[in-house]
Amino acid sequence: MYRIVLGKVSTLSAAPLPPGLREQAPQGPRRERWLAGRALLSHTLSPLPEIIYGEQGKPAFAPETPLWFNLSHSGDDIALLLSDEGEVGCDIEVIRPRANWRWLANAVFSLGEHAEMDAVHPDQQLEMFWRIWTRKEAIVKQRGGSAWQIVSVDSTYHSSLSVSHCQLENLSLAICTPTPFTLTADSVQWIDSVN
């Protein structure tokens, strides 16, 4: 089972949470995203299982819960990928101009990824950049790695993992799963509010 849920940080961060959870939220700029992620999780799973953190800081359910999840956010958008199949990774990005995106692609993309960029019309290369970027991030996050490892990932390499991508209006969403799964717009659930 794979479940993909998307929502808005600004809405979900104000949603009711199970007792004591709001008090665990960090202070500062990460607070709203943290609260929105916990709201998505508690809306999707009730009661919300205990959450622990891996070596690189990746949140996970305690070992006695046979479920895995990953959260990602970009701007006001947040995504949750939930699985009972094994470790998962997801990445969401708002497709937007970035001053140094070509330089960044040259620095971290593999030859195969560069070939994908070169295969599309120049007007579509920014979208392709975000498609490749989100795939790479999803793979790194599935492994529980850090963003610094993105340069060592080739999203065109066919491994035992399944990597799938979907563009949803101005959003680029990619997931990495341990078993085959094809991400489509129909497989995504949008949450407007949580009561």
UniProtKB/Swiss-Prot annotation:
<dbReference type="InterPro" id="IPR037143">
    <property type="entry name" value="4-PPantetheinyl_Trfase_dom_sf"/>
</dbReference>
<dbReference type="GO" id="GO:0000287">
    <property type="term" value="F:magnesium ion binding"/>
</dbReference>
<dbReference type="Pfam" id="PF01648">
    <property type="entry name" value="ACPS"/>
</dbReference>
<comment type="function">
    <text>May be involved in an alternative pathway for phosphopantetheinyl transfer and holo-ACP synthesis in E.coli. The native apo-protein substrate is unknown. Is able to functionally replace AcpS in vivo but only when expressed at high levels.</text>
</comment>
<dbReference type="GO" id="GO:0005829">
    <property type="term" value="C:cytosol"/>
</dbReference>
<comment type="similarity">
    <text>Belongs to the P-Pant transferase superfamily. Gsp/Sfp/HetI/AcpT family.</text>
</comment>
<dbReference type="InterPro" id="IPR008278">
    <property type="entry name" value="4-PPantetheinyl_Trfase_dom"/>
</dbReference>
<dbReference type="GO" id="GO:0008897">
    <property type="term" value="F:holo-[acyl-carrier-protein] synthase activity"/>
</dbReference>
<dbReference type="GO" id="GO:0019878">
    <property type="term" value="P:lysine biosynthetic process via aminoadipic acid"/>
</dbReference>
<keyword id="KW-0808">Transferase</keyword>
<protein>
    <recommendedName>
        <fullName>4'-phosphopantetheinyl transferase AcpT</fullName>
        <ecNumber>2.7.8.7</ecNumber>
    </recommendedName>
</protein>
<dbReference type="InterPro" id="IPR050559">
    <property type="entry name" value="P-Pant_transferase_sf"/>
</dbReference>
